[in-house]
């Protein structure tokens, strides 16, 4: 019992909806308390299937078809593809956890355009604000790249500012690395020392923002899904949390009160 992360997509070929639901039902029956839907491009799910079901259709089918499932998350999603139905599920469905990971990549519009992203900086900020307004306990994560080709100091600063502007609680920071044969590899490159420095600066801003957010959770009541070690797990907003008491059975969901911080997690 515990948390399972399984990919329901393979090589950008979507697994049929009925098969995903059957997988979810079987895993739930085996004792898994939480499932995570993840894939190469999660929000484009269903485009290559008969009837072109949307990700929101898949989530609804899982929740209806696996009534014993207690918690569901989705992996990284594209801001441009969060439609009204998916937004409603993320913000109103009790079994959907209050945590979403957005594929943002950068906070500068020119860099986003050169990355061929489908959203602008304003789109990202607006979506983050909508999510937080509709579900104030939502924790937003994001992928951010430091040192993409042609990024200057001003563009890097706009990406750092995005951490606060988009209420980012969990940031995955990636220093840019050129891949031969890609359009980006043919653009003017940022030097390796500058890339490393910008990645470090992003991590510092993200770390400070996360610590401030974690501190705000002290004294709050949360639900913890106990994982395999019996003494830790994740609460609904995905904050890593350790029990300060005796071990509990893996897979059990416990009501807890947050007592303090434990490094980059809670206790």
List the predicted regions and their residue ranges.
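Radical SAM enzyme [4Fe-4S]-AdoMet core and its adjacent flexible, acidic
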Residues: 46-64, 68, 115, 178-208
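C-terminal, non-catalytic macromolecule-binding modules
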Residues: 134, 153-154, 158-202
């Amino acid at each position: 019992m515990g948390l399972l992360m399984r990919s329901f997509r393979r090589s950008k070929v979507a697994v049929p909806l009925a098969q995903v639901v059957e997988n979810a039902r079987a895993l739930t029956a085996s004792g898994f308390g939480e499932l995570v839907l993840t894939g190469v491009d999660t929000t484009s799910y269903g485009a290559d299937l008969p009837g072109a079901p949307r990700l929101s259709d898949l989530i609804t089918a899982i929740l209806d078809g696996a009534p014993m499932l207690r918690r569901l998350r989705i992996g990284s999603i594209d801001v441009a593809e969060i439609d009204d139905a998916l937004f409603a599920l993320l913000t109103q469905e009790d079994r959907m956890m209050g945590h979403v990971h957005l594929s943002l990549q950068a906070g500068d519009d020119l860099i986003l355009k050169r990355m061929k992203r489908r959203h602008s900086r304003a789109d990202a900020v607006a979506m983050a604000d909508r999510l937080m307004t509709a579900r104030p306990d939502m924790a937003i994560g994001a992928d951010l790249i430091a040192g993409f080709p042609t990024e200057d100091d001003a563009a890097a600063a706009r990406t750092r500012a995005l951490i606060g502007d988009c209420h980012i609680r969990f940031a995955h920071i990636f220093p840019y690395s050129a891949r031969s044969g890609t359009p980006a590899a043919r653009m003017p490159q940022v030097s390796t020392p500058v890339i490393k420095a910008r990645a470090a600066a992003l991590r510092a801003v993200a770390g400070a923002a996360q610590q401030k957010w974690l501190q705000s959770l002290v004294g709050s009541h949360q639900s913890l899904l106990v994982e395999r070690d019996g003494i830790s797990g994740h609460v609904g907003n995905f904050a890593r949390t350790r029990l300060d008491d005796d071990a509990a059975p893996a897979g059990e969901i416990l009501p807890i009160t947050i007592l303090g911080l434990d490094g980059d997690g809670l206790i």
